[in-house]
Design a protein with these regions (language model features):
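Helicase motor core with emphasis on the C-terminal RecA-like subdomain
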Residues: 52, 74-84, 89-168, 175-449, ...
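Short, solvent-exposed secondary-structure boundary/capping segments
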Residues: 571-588
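Short, well-ordered loop/turn sites that connect or cap secondary structure elements
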Residues: 525-527, 552, 559
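A conserved acidic, glycine/proline-rich C-terminal tail/linker
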Residues: 540-556
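Short beta-strand-centered aromatic/proline hotspots
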Residues: 565-568
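Conserved pre-motif I regulatory segment
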Residues: 11-60
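Walker A/P-loop
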Residues: 55-74
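Extended, highly charged accessory segments
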Residues: 458-461, 465-530, 544, 588, ...
Length: 878
């Protein structure tokens, strides 16, 4: 048991007995459970009794551990108690929220059957007393963006007792008078995949919706959080329960059964040499390995990191090994019907393999998976645990998986990642704090419910964990913006969204159109430019990026959903296709941002580099593995190929530079671009093992300082393992670098970075997102959807003028916060600079004729030199 501030977090390590757990359920529910399941799972031995006793509970447990049943069964039991007493009303008692519509559909199906079966037992036992005593069946319903108008009307007339929904639909419901009547008496709230929500603005949005709902309910509601890979648990618990009156965090019981399922996973290299083996042979080896795993298992799930990678793997498996309809792709750009069909077939055992990017990462029910393959690093330990954990769909089964590396740096990353999976470590997440765009959206929503006092509204907002530290001045500034108090915005058609009486200190609804505007524009997910793909018979296939379509010419062939299509023509935002006869595709590149390496994994890689690097010696005359290094590598969950490749890679770096950069030592190479004879570009290569989110900050501020000294704009190549500064033909010396590091270690880097990003495309794009969430730029006006291009144009025009209006304008301030704290990692970057200043992290500057081996991947994928994918192999060999 730990007391944190005024918040009592109780970590439970002693489960209740089976008898205590089962007697918490009523007779019919208990009999149904014992008939269906042989025993209680670890989380159920805690949860059944705790939820029955009305405690707030956070449950973390792996896929297949009965986690969902842990959250629901005590609630179902209580609702059947009400039914047996003739007191079950036509209203909502429990709201279940998840980030995925597909997960909601699963929950609906998985609850409907137990509810039917339990009620059938009651009918069998009670007979005609069912009618006499008004014993109703417990009902469940789904309310998402996919719910039809007819279903919504029926829910208003006869609301389900358990309502399954999404954060966005919940926000709509708390602004509907009819729905408020039905949900105003809820007793339970379940948040599934809580870590997935709490780490982003969808979760921030949800937290305010929950506190607004609590203000409507005016009583304690039991809160239940579910997730598979949650760390730190305190952060998730605080997000779940929030604060009560008096700024005291509510109590929460924490059930940590996250490692109750055994994982067997190995990192491997498809060949014994990832440099000198031809690309074609490496590809052949990868697909041969995948084919072997598929054939040796009843069902295999393959994860890639991109949708284009998913399409490529499906196409290659079909073309190389003759797979047909027994293999399928699953990702977010495919139609809902296609995704549901794949999920159903996989669950029924009709597919031997499904390839996915992230869409099957969370707990969608896909039945029993025997094996999981991860192609390349997942960039996160938690993500690896989540993905590998999809194998073995029961708490006693072993989750078996392989992580196949694609190059030498990827191999080190995969090896350290898998090692930490085995060591039961996770990455940490943090919740965005005081997001002013989401706040603005909810203030508008609140104004539609009633007239609010500013202090009353401020107190309510601060009950949500992400806003507990919100400054009153920022709250007032946001209300001033929404109240139309900023002069100069009218000519951009930005008008007041609420009535705000500054003297009285109150705000409320502004005009009849406010409700429509709110309902049509709420949510936190920004609009993307996507082109819908249709066949000639008007069947929707999926979507592609607009930028990709502009590159296509008539009769080009591309892959989507694991099938080939011929491009026929473009009609506005539609792409018309036909089934392709050719076997040569153009795989569509989705231009989504590449996943950044987590800070924790970056640090573990740095520690591994130091540990293995300390075993190396310049006296070593050959590449045979020394005893100390052999002992370290033998403890890693890697194959023989991986062991040999990693050691050779380290030896190459060490013999060339005498240094292995790590988490305590930054190597700075003063070198020149390879593969050019005249006008060689001068490069400064920083081997900083902190991940891209931090390296983004370090590279920008270093480039700013150096650029000012040299009077030039400096090109940056950014990676997870470091960054490269291209200074052209100019020369720097070590003293200059020392001075810059000294300056930036004590500088106000937040101010520097704001100046750096102010005119960038990144700022323009992110401001559009923030302005959309904050209702400054509408995405829909009176039912007419406003295109992304129009939104972008409107937001850029506003951004040009906003500094002159107020440099601390709430949505401008929020854009900077989102970039520096959500996209980048300002707190950790500041800590690293402090550690450099204090000497805890050291740096070494060396001159090299050519970039060292550890720099090669940065150069190749940064596109600085004229290295193409075709001659990458040759470059690395040289």
């Amino acid at each position: 048991m730990y007391a944190i501030g005024y918040f009592l977090i109780e970590y439970l390590d002693k489960p209740f007995s089976d008898e205590q757990s089962l007697t918490a359920l009523n007779l019919y529910v208990r009999n149904w459970f014992l008939d269906k399941f042989k025993e209680l799972t670890p989380p159920q031995k805690f949860a059944f009794k705790l939820i029955n006793d009305k405690f707030n509970v956070l449950i973390t447990a792996p896929t297949g551990s009965g986690k969902t049943m842990s959250g629901f069964l005590s609630i179902i039991s209580k609702l059947f108690d009400y039914a047996l007493e003739g007191k079950l009303e036509n209203r909502v008692y429990c709201i279940y929220v998840s980030p995925l519509r597909s997960l909601n559909n699963d929950i609906y199906k998985n609850l409907s059957v137990p509810l039917d079966e339990i009620y059938a037992q009651i009918i069998k036992n009670k007979g005609m007393d069912i009618i006499k005593n008004n014993i109703k069946k417990v009902s469940v319903g789904v309310r998402t963006g996919d719910t039809t108008q007819k279903e919504r009307r029926l829910q208003l007339i006869r609301p389900p007792n358990i309502l399954v929904t999404t954060p966005e639909s919940l926000a709509i419901m708390i602004n509907s008078k009819r729905f408020i009547e039905n949900i105003g008496g809820i007793e339970y709230l379940i948040i599934d995949e809580i870590h997935e929500l709490a780490s982003n603005k969808r979760g921030v949005h949800l937290s305010l919706s929950i506190e607004r709902l609590m203000a409507i309910v005016k009583k304690n509601v039991v809160r239940i959080g579910l997730g598979a890979t949650i760390y730190p648990l305190e952060e998730a618990a605080k997000f779940l329960v929030g604060y009560s009156a008096g700024n005291t965090l509510r109590e929460c019981k924490v059930i940590d059964a996250s490692w109750s399922k055994k994982l067997e996973v190995i990192a491997l290299s498809p060949v014994n040499d990832l440099v000198h083996t031809p690309n074609k042979d490496i590809d052949n080896a990868i697909y041969k390995k995948i084919d072997s795993i598929i054939k040796n298992n009843r069902s295999t799930l393959i994860f890639t990191n991109t949708r284009s990678g998913t399409e490529r793997v499906v196409f290659n498996l079909k073309s190389r090994y003759g797979y047909g309809n027994d293999i399928a792709a699953h990702h977010g750009s495919l139609s809902k019907d296609t995704r549901l069909e794949v999920e159903e077939k996989l669950k029924k055992g009709e597919l031997s393999c499904v390839v996915t990017s992230t869409s099957l990462e969370l707990g969608v029910d896909i039945g029993s998976i025997e094996n999981v393959i991860q192609l390349g690093s997942s960039k996160s330990i938690s993500r690896a645990v989540q993905r590998i954990g999809r194998a073995g769909h029961s708490f006693k089964s072993i989750a078996i998986g392989e992580v196949i590396a694609l190059d030498r740096d990827d191999l080190i990353e995969c090896s350290v990642m898998v090692d930490n999976v085995i060591k039961k470590r996770l990455d940490s997440f943090s919740t965005p704090k005081n997001a002013l765009d989401v706040l603005a959206q909810h203030i508008i929503g609140m104004s539609l419910n009633k007239k609010w006092g500013v202090d009353e509204a401020y107190d309510l907002v601060r009950k949500a964990y992400p806003y507990n530290t919100l400054d009153k001045n920022e709250f007032i500034a946001t209300i001033n913006y929404l109240g139309g108090k900023y002069l100069g915005l009218e000519h951009h058609r930005v008008y007041g969204k609420i009535w705000y009486d500054e003297k009285e200190g109150t705000f409320n609804q502004r005009g009849r159109l406010s409700q429509v505007m709110y309902m049509l524009n709420l949510g936190t997910i920004p609009d993307d430019v996507a082109i819908n793909v249709f066949t000639l018979d008007k069947k929707w296939v999926g979507s592609i990026e607009e930028e990709f379509m502009t590159k296509m010419k008539q009769h080009d062939i591309f892959a989507l959903g694991g099938k080939l299509y011929e491009f026929l023509e473009a009609k506005e935002t539609r792409c018309i296709v036909a089934a392709a006869k050719s076997l040569t595709p153009t795989i569509p590149p989705w231009f989504s941002e590449q996943l950044p390496l987590s800070f924790e994994l970056a640090q573990y890689i740095g520690e591994f580099r130091k540990k293995l690097g300390d075993t190396l010696s310049l006296k070593q005359k050959n590449k045979s593995i020394n005893k100390k290094a052999d002992a370290i590598l033998n403890l890693m969950p890697i194959d023989k190929n991986a062991k040999k490749i990693i050691y050779n890679y380290f030896i190459e770096q060490f013999l060339y530079t005498k240094i292995i950069p790590n988490n305590e030592l930054i190597l700075i190479e003063d070198t020149f671009e390879p593969n050019s004879t005249k006008n060689k570009k001068h490069l400064l290569i920083f081997h900083s093992m902190f991940g891209r989110r931090i390296n983004d900050i370090l590279s920008r501020i270093f480039a700013m300082e150096l650029g000012e000294i040299l009077d030039m704009n400096i090109d940056i190549i950014l990676s997870d393992n470091g960054f490269i500064l291209n200074i052209g033909e100019l020369i720097v010396n070590s003293q200059m670098i020392d001075e810059i590091i000294s300056n930036i270690s004590s500088a106000n880097i937040s101010t520097m970075l704001k100046h750096n990003i102010r005119k960038t495309e990144l700022m323009k794009r992110r401001f559009r997102h923030v302005a959309g969430r904050g209702f400054m730029v509408l995405r829909n006006y009176k039912g007419n959807k406003i295109g992304v291009r129009k939104q972008q144009l409107n937001s850029q025009m506003i951004l040009k003028d906003i500094d002159q209006i107020d440099k601390n304008f709430p949505l401008l301030k929020e854009t900077y916060r989102e970039i520096l704290y959500d996209l980048m990692d300002m707190p950790r970057a500041q800590q690293i600079l402090y550690d450099i200043k204090e000497g805890k992290i050291k740096y070494k500057i060396i001159k090299t004729k050519f970039p060292s081996p550890f720099a090669h991947k940065m150069l190749i994928f940064g596109g600085l030199s004229n290295i193409t994918l075709e001659n990458t192999q040759q470059y690395l060999q040289n």
